Amino acid sequence: MDSYEYNELLKKLQTKVENIGSIVKPDDIKARLKEIEAIEQDPDFWQDIARAGALNKEKTKISNMLAKFSDANQAVSDAKELFELANSENDEETINSLFEDAKNLDEKIVNLEISMLLSGEDDGKNAIVSIHPGAGGTESNDWASMLYRMYLRFCEREGFKVETLDFQEGEEAGLKDVSFIVKGENAYGYFKAENGIHRLVRTSPFDSAGRRHTSFSSVMVSPEVDDDIEIEIEEKDLKIDTYRASGAGGQHVNKTESAIRITHIPTGIVVQCQNDRSQHKNRATAMKMLKSRLYELELMKQQEASNSVEKSEIGWGHQIRSYVLFPYQQVKDNRSGEAYSQTDAILDGDIKKMIEGVLIAQKAEA
């Protein structure tokens, strides 16, 4: 890096920070924090626990955003000031030190961008994720299992907790269906980028002739619906089936028909849960899954109506990413346009940067 490149980087980062500032509105956040602090002084503040909890959650969220913005803004300002001073004094040591730190400064602004992109109403919620293999039998079942493992490894890396709600093993390998809930900060904000069709191209380990196969799996992601969100579901619109828990449902597999499958007739949405020995608990969880799916469906309808996203980007049937393992190795995301050669690392859960690339690309198009 030379002085011209560094100066251009500072200009780019300064513009980014200013653009983020126009969205974040730090002065408005400071004013809102003062409002909340005044409300907290009320002796009756904790009488309404739900309201107090919501305000505390809001306070933490906007305080964190303000701190990140202030830190990034100050970092760019300090770097600019120090660079100008070092140039005026021909201080090569300081200039080289700034060059070496350029990557860290750039990453700080990217992290601020991501924080801003994950500040949506539902981004902070837990995520309910379902993976369904496409046509292709064992090959597709195995691909669904590979995706499931990729997400589990990603959750381990990021400190998300995972609870499997339903797991149905494939007949020869892989899985026929899996649903799980991801719990943690911005779980839905990250996982919403995985909503869509995932395509795999590889030499099949199940083909004795070693031919190339293409497999598909769909990933569906919904925000876990809070109890305070009302979604009306009429009993007449539901078809409820019970069945025996099977496969890798875990230690709770038993001989009673405790597993629940609920079909929402008007939309055709199907949810399943076999996580618990209790049919009653499985039904409650399945209903929560259904509410989350219906909530997500309504959000997508609103987005489509407002034209905030292209129609092709909305549905769960949209192909979002290709994973090519043969004849070359590359993962390409159709939304960001980015291609990655570290296929092994990605399938081992190293997908954070790829997801963040999608979030940034989608914001740029909005």
UniProtKB/Swiss-Prot annotation:
An example molecular function term from Gene Ontology annotations: translation release factor activity, codon specific
Coiled-coil spans in chain: none
Keywords, comma-separated and alphabetical: Cytoplasm, Methylation, Protein biosynthesis
Post-translational modification (record): Methylated by PrmC. Methylation increases the termination efficiency of RF2.
N5-methylglutamine sites (modified residues): 251
Main location: cytoplasm
Any Pfam family matching the protein: PCRF
GO CC terms of this entry: cytoplasm
Protein transport is among the record's keywords: no
Compartments in which it is found: Cytoplasm
Organism domain of life: Bacteria
Entry similarity comment: Belongs to the prokaryotic/mitochondrial release factor family.
Free-text function comment from the UniProt entry: Peptide chain release factor 2 directs the termination of translation in response to the peptide chain termination codons UGA and UAA.
Protein name: Peptide chain release factor 2
Organism: Campylobacter concisus (strain 13826)
